[in-house]
């Protein structure tokens, strides 16, 4: 049984909460994967990836660019989407387990061909 595990976490405003949660277990090492570091290649050294929460995904990624105006989406960071697409591509190519929380789950869904409704009450 492996005594040490390395988990990559995508960067977000609550990164330290995720880091503390994972590092509360002995033998867990966390790698911060960030568009600011452009370190998607570090995914390859990780045993698994946690895609964190945060801003809305670009609706163009799931074929609905009109949603930006239709739903008044303002918190979109295209550079984060592009970076995390690189991370998920590397993770899946390396058959690494992935976990998405909130935005992270939406990212995985869209990457695998799914779609989203940005504001369920508005539908």
Report residues per predicted region:
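Conserved G/P- and acidic residue-centered "switch" motifs that form tight phosphate/ATP-binding loops
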Residues: 102
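Cytosolic ligand/metal-binding cores
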Residues: 106
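N-terminal beta1-alpha1 cap of cysteine-dependent amidohydrolase-like domains
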Residues: 1-99, 110-117, 121-123
């Amino acid at each position: 049984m492996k005594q040490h595990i390395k988990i990559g976490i995508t960067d977000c405003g609550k990164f330290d909460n995720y880091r503390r949660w994972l590092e509360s277990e002995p033998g867990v090492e966390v790698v911060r994967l960030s568009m600011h570091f452009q370190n998607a290649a570090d995914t390859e050294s990780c045993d698994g990836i946690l895609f964190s929460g945060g801003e809305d995904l670009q609706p163009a990624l799931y074929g609905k660019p009109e949603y930006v105006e239709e739903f008044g989406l303002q918190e979109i960071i295209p550079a984060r989407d592009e970076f995390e697409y690189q991370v998920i591509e590397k993770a899946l190519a390396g058959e690494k387990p992935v976990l998405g929380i909130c935005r992270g789950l939406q990212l995985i869904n869209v990457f695998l061909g799914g779609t989203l409704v940005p504001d369920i009450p508005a539908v």
